[in-house]
Amino acid sequence: IQPFAMLDMQLYSGKRLDSMKSCELIALPQQMDIKQMAYASVIAEVTEALTEAHEPQEDIYELLVGAVQILSRNNPRLVALSAICKLLVLTGFAPVYDACVNCTEAVEGDAFFSVVQGGLICEACHGGEELPFSSGAQKLLQELIALDFNDPQPFTVRGGDLMQLEQILYRFIVYQIDKPLKSLSFLAQLGL
């Protein structure tokens, strides 16, 4: 079975392993290069970590289909990060990014992010161990959550904001699932 293909499968639950009764190909993904495949793997691993097996979740399925379809036409790094942001929202793990998680005051401008508390920390509540969370990275998070995979509109991304948001989200996810993401090691090996 080709990775990231859309399939219609009939599975039967076994004691230790499921068995496949039938499998029909619905669609193959666009041809992917190694970079696109690596980012698709990150999306798949995060999805597996944040969702329950054997629980149908149509909204997550549609998100994954949309992400795979645009990976080859758009910046795969941004597509993957957008898909992860959307997954966090759909699975109830979305970080708080509009108000301080300590004092609940609205935050405008640069702030910090607490991986442990799962959200924004204002300057007054900053304890020293939080990650920097610039206003640009906050805005990028909002844009990635709102990105329409069916009709992606162009927007400008500063490299520093992208790297900061990636660091925040990947650390947050690793903290939530309590294990490293192997696909991130693969990205690092590729120099991505």
Label the model's feature ranges.
Residues 1-192:
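Non-catalytic alpha-helical scaffolds and adjoining flexible linkers that form interface surfaces
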